[in-house]
């Protein structure tokens, strides 16, 4: 409905000769007694125009030109708010758009085909995916879905961390376990990966190679084999959750020299040096962030010659600009909070428009089973694995639970709740609304001959006017605005909350408004309202990546 009100208000501002730099904001009042929608444009503009906000609001009302029959009344309230009351026939007539557009309802064009890249998961291939990584994966997948829904050309990317010290430790860990299989005595370091999967990889190498690698120098064979096996496992886990990627960017390409011997990493240092932001001391290469007002400079290359995380991250982001992405979205875990601002500062220094970059930081996850918290540690081998969680509660519950809290909030994943097959379980509650509608439609076909493929006259919707019907219809019409809002905030949780409200309103409508036992036209009208609800649920489920069961 935002798109219904905003142009009319903008036209009224022009007609009244009111020039304001304030955006036209449309809100839903907390109580229906204040109308269906409201705007605070008069309140926001009054000070800069030197006018009384209520007087300005009244003046603006005189220039509003809504379509005939759409507005029941318009009133000024409080310190200059303009409240709008829609007519029931207009609300119900507008609902026909849901059925006319079908799967396209809620899809926008604001992206206009602009290239957007969403990077998510990007876990080191040092072990199976943990539950903590799963949250970022689902969050990123939903954010990519939101961008696609608004008309962007989206690339979903996985930054494949196949370089650095952790990968070296992985290779060493597998080598130690392999040597044990060869009968060698090994003092396995506490700092290395100890999970059972390390032994499984060592077993595979031993079965294929015997003890031929026992005296081999280095860990190359062990690292490459482990990397391939683990990354294949990661992909399979992501597939189970419906998480997909279009491209995989290998970190090692940032270390690969060109024909002049320069790497992407070294070119970053050279470019920052030319800008006066690089110095070498204490055997390391430093990014002079004290010049930016920070207390300390940041290491880009350690005294060991190993780059810090900041350097390849800067180089990687430069490739996103080089590839022509107008919108760059990074979905990070909370462990990136301290690092990414330095990456942004470096990109600014190098002359790039960092307003094109959007960051979604998701906080940590803990899991509780039987009321007790499960601890996670990939290295210690007692990690709470994502595959185990999917086995336990299913893909739909796993996805929804990961995003039913704000990404900015710590998430406690209640496994006991996710297992429940009752309305207490949020995913069950949502899917039951869809299944209930499907069951109703089957009964309508069997008893009344109602065919969802051959709809009755949509004008029948205008005969509905009960509070339950109007509340549900208005909520359904909010769907496109909710998609845009969730995208603007990079917050799929907004969609979860909205979908829950739709399910709640439908259950209330179902209880209060007889459908199949009503008079024929009323029954058909309520079936149309049910169909519109099913369509919005399906469209929302598609964004959230959960299934829409027809029976439960």
UniProtKB/Swiss-Prot annotation:
GO terms for biological process: arginyl-tRNA aminoacylation. Its main location: cytoplasm. One of its GO terms (cellular component) is cytoplasm. Gene3D superfamilies: Arginyl tRNA synthetase N-terminal domain, HUPs, Isoleucyl-tRNA Synthetase, Domain 1. It catalyses: tRNA(Arg) + L-arginine + ATP = L-arginyl-tRNA(Arg) + AMP + diphosphate. It comes from the Bacteria. It is an enzyme of class 6 (ligase). It is found in: Cytoplasm. GO terms for molecular function: arginine-tRNA ligase activity; ATP binding. Keywords: Aminoacyl-tRNA synthetase, ATP-binding, Cytoplasm, Ligase, Nucleotide-binding, Protein biosynthesis. Pfam families: Arg_tRNA_synt_N (PF03485), DALR_1 (PF05746), tRNA-synt_1d (PF00750). SMART domains: Arg_tRNA_synt_N (SM01016), DALR_1 (SM00836). Its EC number is 6.1.1.19. A motif ('HIGH' region) lies at residues 123-133. Belongs to the class-I aminoacyl-tRNA synthetase family. PANTHER family: ARGININE--TRNA LIGASE, CYTOPLASMIC, ARGINYL-TRNA SYNTHETASE. Monomer. This is Arginine--tRNA ligase. It comes from Chlorobium phaeovibrioides (strain DSM 265 / 1930). The lineage of its organism: Bacteria, Pseudomonadati, Chlorobiota, Chlorobiia, Chlorobiales.
């Amino acid at each position: 409905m935002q798109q219904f009100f905003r142009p009319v208000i903008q036209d009224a501002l022009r007609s009244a000769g009111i020039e304001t730099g304030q955006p036209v904001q449309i809100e839903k009042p907390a109580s229906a007694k204040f109308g269906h929608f409201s705007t605070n444009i008069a309140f926001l503009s009054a000070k800069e125009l030197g006018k009384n906000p209520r007087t300005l609001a009244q003046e603006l009302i005189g220039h509003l030109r809504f379509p005939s029959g759409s507005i029941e009344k318009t009133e000024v309230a409080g310190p200059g708010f303009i409240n709008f009351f829609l007519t029931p026939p207009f609300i119900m007539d507008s609902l026909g758009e849901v059925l006319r557009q079908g799967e396209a309802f809620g899809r926008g064009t604001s992206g206009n085909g602009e290239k957007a890249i969403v990077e998510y998961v990007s876990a080191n291939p040092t072990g199976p995916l943990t539950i903590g990584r799963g949250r970022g994966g689902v969050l990123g997948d939903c954010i990519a879905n939101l961008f696609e829904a608004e008309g962007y050309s989206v690339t979903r990317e996985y930054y494949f961390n196949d370089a650095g010290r952790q990968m070296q430790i992985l290779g060493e860990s597998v080598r130690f376990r392999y040597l044990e299989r060869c009968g060698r005595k090994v003092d396995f370091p506490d700092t290395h990966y100890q999970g059972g999967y390390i032994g499984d990889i060592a077993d595979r190498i031993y079965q294929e190679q015997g003890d031929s690698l026992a005296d081999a120098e280095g860990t190359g064979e062990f690292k490459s084999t482990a990397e391939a096996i683990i990354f294949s496992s990661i992909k399979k886990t992501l597939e189970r959750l419906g998480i997909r990627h279009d491209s995989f960017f290998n970190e090692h390409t940032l270390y690969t020299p060109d024909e002049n011997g320069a790497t992407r990493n070294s070119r970053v240092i050279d470019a920052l040096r030319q800008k006066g932001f690089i110095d070498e001391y204490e055997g390391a290469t430093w990014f002079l962030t004290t010049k930016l007002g920070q207390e300390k400079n940041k290491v880009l290359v350690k005294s060991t010659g190993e780059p810090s995380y900041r350097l390849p991250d800067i180089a990687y982001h430069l490739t996103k600009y080089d590839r022509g992405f107008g919108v760059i979205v990074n979905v990070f875990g909370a462990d990136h909070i301290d690092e990414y601002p330095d990456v942004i500062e470096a990109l600014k220094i190098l002359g790039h428009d960092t307003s094109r970059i959007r960051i979604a930081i998701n906080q940590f996850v803990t899991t509780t089973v039987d009321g007790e918290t499960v601890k996670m540690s990939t290295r210690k081998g007692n990690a709470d694995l994502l595959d185990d969680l999917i086995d336990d509660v299913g893909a739909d519950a796993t996805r929804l639970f990961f995003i039913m809290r704000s990404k900015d909030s710590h998430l406690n994943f209640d496994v006991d709740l996710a297992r429940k097959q009752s309305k207490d379980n949020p995913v069950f509650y949502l899917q039951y609304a869809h299944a209930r509608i499907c069951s109703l439609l089957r009964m309508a076909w069997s008893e009344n001959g109602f065919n969802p493929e051959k709809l009755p006259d949509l004008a029948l919707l205008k005969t509905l006017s009960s509070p339950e019907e109007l509340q549900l219809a208005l909520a359904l019409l909010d769907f496109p605005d909710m998609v845009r809002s969730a995208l603007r905030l990079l917050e799929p949780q907004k969609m979860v909350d909205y979908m829950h409200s739709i399910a709640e309103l439908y259950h209330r409508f179902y209880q209060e408004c007889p459908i199949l036992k009503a008079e024929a036209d009323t029954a058909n009208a309520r079936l149309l309202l049910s169909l519109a609800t099913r369509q919005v649920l399906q469209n929302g489920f598609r964004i959230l990546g959960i299934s829409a069961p027809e029976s439960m």
